[in-house]
């Protein structure tokens, strides 16, 4: 529903609800993590989490896009992340690895999402689900990657500053 002036009830012209997007990212993280651990089939993981998500208000289409995007582009995402890591992708903690893959997908394939939003969401997700200092690692990797991947947006300065 729009308010006068063309803004949605969420205060954005594009109608995107940031809260629902955040929930979708958290659920996508859980789905990618489950896929990494179980080695399950992408469609099964998406179907399971989409069914569970039906009971939680979230952006289901965005959730599905994130999970399908990460799972179908895993090799490319890992290759893109490798120069910014201090170890192999597989040696990165499973939660931080899932966070990095999701953020890399958004930074590389979802140019409609500002890089600062991607990085800040990744940091908050890593704080919530990751190891004690995992968010610091995620921030460092994504700050460096965003400068290269989103040159026009990030300019020569650092990325998030967080």
Curated annotation (Swiss-Prot):
GO aspect biological process, one term: DNA-templated transcription termination
Family annotation (Gene3D superfamilies): NusB-like
Pfam families in the cross-refs: NusB
Keywords: RNA-binding, Transcription, Transcription antitermination, Transcription regulation
Domain of life (superkingdom): Bacteria
Matching InterPro entries: NusB-like_sf, NusB_fam, NusB_RsmB_TIM44
Transmembrane segments: none
GO molecular function (one): RNA binding
UniProt GO cellular component terms: cytosol
Similarity annotation: Belongs to the NusB family.
Function: Involved in transcription antitermination. Required for transcription of ribosomal RNA (rRNA) genes. Binds specifically to the boxA antiterminator sequence of the ribosomal RNA (rrn) operons.
Name of the protein in its database record: Transcription antitermination protein NusB
Organism: Xanthomonas euvesicatoria pv. vesicatoria (strain 85-10) (Xanthomonas campestris pv. vesicatoria)
GN (gene name): nusB
